[in-house]
Amino acid sequence: MSGPRPVRAPRGSALTALGWQQEAALRMLQNNLDPEVAEHPDKLVVYGGTGKAARDWRSFDAMVRTLQTLKQDETMLVQSGRPVGVMQTHEWAPRVLIANSNLVGDWANWEEFRRLEALGLTMYGQMTAGSWIYIGTQGILQGTYETFAAVAAKKFGGTLAGTITLTAGLGGMGGAQPLAVTMNDGVAICIDVDPRAIERRIEHRYLDVKADSPEHALQLAVEARDARRPLSIGLLGNAAELLPRMLAESAPIDIVTDQTSAHDPLAYLPLGVDFDDMAGLAAEKPADFTRRARESMARHVEAMVGFMDAGAEVFDYGNSIRGEARLAGYDRAFDFPGFVPAYIRPLFCEGKGPFRWAALSGEASDIHKTDKAMLELFPENESLHRWIRMAGERVHFQGLPARICWLGYGERDKAGERFNDMVASGELAAPLAIGRDHLDCGSVASPYRETEAMLDGSDAIADWPLLNAMVNVASGASWVSLHHGGGVGMGRSIHAGQVSVADGTKLAGEKIRRVLTNDPGMGVIRHVDAGYDIAENVAADQGVRVPMTEGN
């Protein structure tokens, strides 16, 4: 069958390909488009505005067909969501190499990208959409949870109880915000223009209730705040209208951030445009739509700055809304920081980042067993134990059961090897796909997000994600990806990802040990090179070799 159709990854231990590395890539590609997982599966859009798993349905079918027949010493090459070749390599090489959305510098902008996309020559891969390791909203949940925990520690005595957070965006990424806030015992008002997004987050248990109006939302929020009761509230509307209104009315807001699809102006609803007319207007008049969207973002960001001036804790959550507002002429757009320099960079210095794994069996029990193994492996990691317990109780699986937790250098390899042993012993029903977000300690160059305000000024140096991709290829990852524009939009980021399959074999164990040591090791090295003392101490303690620090 050609064209849109429901897609669901196979379950169980029976192979539909010639080996588990190929089978894992096949299942994770299909899982990205599972209706439980993808935001708009009929359009091949997984998350992040227009982040796709395949360029078109013909390309999707060709990738499925190729993966089913790919040999153990062959590698499929994917160019922006289309399979363009199969090469004979060797068993240590990745089974798939992926390059998505990459453009030469002077051409790296949305206008040129859209021209090429209209010609059928490229696609937007976001981060984990085109690299086939998206696991639904859980994929960003712990990072969002840890960010709000850091806000609580910095400003509110270690808890968000008794506070109200105001934010917008309830898509695949932003949908993690309400649960992340309530996991920290706070109250959240979450705005979105799409009623379906609000309903989907309630259905998946990330969002508690929907308010009838801004006044109703504030009433619910204040009641819950005063009772120190966690609550997340969905509010239908345009943040560019509602935030200025709430600011003018002196709404009692303690924290403000945003996760709308501001990275792509065509995915941000301008003031004065009905949501139902959005797609048509964006397609018919993209330049005018972009101008109006940026003007609306400027109003949105101006209100965020206003809340900051009034005493709220305000931060950019990495969607480039400050950059877009500045393009619209708002001079104070960068008065508040991004979340990485404000809260996350010390973790990056330790090689910590979003480690994730998916049960290819489709059995939730496999994830529960790996949860138990994680608690046994790291008995003294209190934050990990708290997270695993909360995730087990509150996280709804989308598609293949999966788990995410932030692990650092010297931890990821231990977890991966333990998982491989569990597959080998038969404790798990089938192999695991072990990967991560491209948002990681050593795999991104993104001056508006992961590498904002680097100590040595190296925000825009893009050698690091390229080195990261090459290191993962050399170390034996099952598939490796190199993308452009994820998270913050065209011209603003280069980033790499890897997935390694734990199939229980000795070879898989050797690969996993190398990949899951070297991949986070790149984060330590990158931050040592930038002059961070924490990273230098980790490198010294853990034996990470950095030639420029040797022989001094």
Swiss-Prot record:
Source domain of life: Bacteria
Pathway the protein takes part in: Amino-acid degradation; L-histidine degradation into L-glutamate; N-formimidoyl-L-glutamate from L-histidine: step 2/3
Keyword terms of this UniProt record: Cytoplasm, Histidine metabolism, Lyase, NAD
Catalytic residues of the enzyme: 405
Binding sites annotated in the UniProt record for NAD(+): 48-49, 126, 172-174, 192, 238-239, 259-263, 268-269, 317, 487
UniProt-listed Enzyme Commission number(s): 4.2.1.49
Catalysed reaction, written as an equation: 4-imidazolone-5-propanoate = trans-urocanate + H2O
MF (Gene Ontology): urocanate hydratase activity
Any matching Pfam family: Urocanase_N
Keyword Transferase found: no
Listed cofactors: NAD(+)
InterPro entries for the chain: Urocanase, Urocanase-like, Urocanase_C, Urocanase_central_sf, Urocanase_CS, Urocanase_N, Urocanase_Rossmann-like, Urocanase_sf
Gene Ontology terms: biological process: L-histidine catabolic process to glutamate and formamide; L-histidine catabolic process to glutamate and formate
NAD in keyword set: yes
Annotated transmembrane regions: none
UniProt cross-references to HAMAP family, sorted A to Z: HutU
Entry function: Catalyzes the conversion of urocanate to 4-imidazolone-5-propionate.
Name of the protein this chain belongs to: Urocanate hydratase
Source species: Streptomyces griseus subsp. griseus (strain JCM 4626 / CBS 651.72 / NBRC 13350 / KCC S-0626 / ISP 5235)
